[in-house]
């Protein structure tokens, strides 16, 4: 506006260079199982590891378990990069023997995961079953796996026991971490044709879907067999305003990663 008066404040009202905006508050969502049971899930308000999202891959794995209880009932389960931990909670509800739910060792993320475990326990009979079944802990992909294995049998110092089931939900966009993810699978998945790592994901950046799929090349190189076992096209993508092929962004794919017969001999 012409004729404005400069009162000499200059840039006084601008944010200082070292200003850090406040972290968004935690959020919550309700996931309803096919049985009709609601599960309240708390999420951190923001996270550089993307733990503030309830990913479509996690929802689809939860449904996948409920469609056939034998996939988790009585089994030991490890989830990597779990965020809210939805598949782990569903596995515990459906009768898994032991569940270890992990994400990056950020105190806020682990606190939220534990809160979800505690609140889920309050809705399941008998009380105490979920908290006794599910351990929430921090873990960096590719790190020493002994602390994970120790949760299966704390009194066994050999840590030879491994997990029947691994869960990786919407992690493959972390291309630089594929090798570390496979390393952890290799060190924690029971060497048996019956054990399986479930890898469900969407290529949220469609132009990088080949890089997402590169995870399975690394898995094959490390002695695993890979089989696509599920695919679902959703009504809308998780991120509605993102660029790229909309059909790819709405599609969730599920793969089973298993030890080869040769590796099991």
From Swiss-Prot:
Keywords: Cytoplasm, Methyltransferase, S-adenosyl-L-methionine, Transferase. It is found in: Cytoplasm. It holds the Pfam family Methyltransf_16. PROSITE patterns: SAM_MT_NNT1. Signal peptide: none annotated. Gene3D superfamilies: Vaccinia Virus protein VP39. It is an enzyme of class 2 (transferase). GO terms for molecular function: N-terminal protein N-methyltransferase activity; protein-lysine N-methyltransferase activity. GO terms for cellular component: cytoplasm. This is Protein N-terminal and lysine N-methyltransferase EFM7. It comes from Gibberella zeae (strain ATCC MYA-4620 / CBS 123657 / FGSC 9075 / NRRL 31084 / PH-1) (Wheat head blight fungus). The gene is EFM7.
